[in-house]
Amino acid sequence: MSKAIIVADLKYKSPKRRGRGTGHKGLHSTLKYVQYREDHNAKASAEKLRDRWQDRGLGAHYREIFEACDRLKSKHVLAWTWVVSPAPDLMALVPETRRRDLVMDVTERVVEAYYEARGYQTPPYSYVLHDRLTDEGEQQLHTHVILPGLAP
């Protein structure tokens, strides 16, 4: 059995509240958590965590992103949430000083290629890079990507 090189997890947030983590409140909470979650190796100031979004047209702060998603929602989708996570054992082969930039580059290429392959223009989106440890103690750099509900 082959092993995934990059794991992409695509989900959506409905505008309707159907329990914990759903609806407008669920998206707002998710965006705030993603923005302020600390990395495994550093205690960061709230000011540093505030500036961690990579804005590709959707916003650079969780409130701005939330408002854009609310404005650009569809009937059934408030926002799309993706997680792009390269395999930790493969990332370990990359020099540590280049890993963050590589994961950010891969994220942008994944988003752009997804829409290009379907014949669509890339919609506005934002993403944040997280650094966590796996249960085995390996570094797991990954990104959380947010796209508006109108994105195809």
Positions of PLM-derived features:
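N-terminal nicking endonuclease/strand-transfer module with a His-rich metal-binding environment
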Residues: 1-152
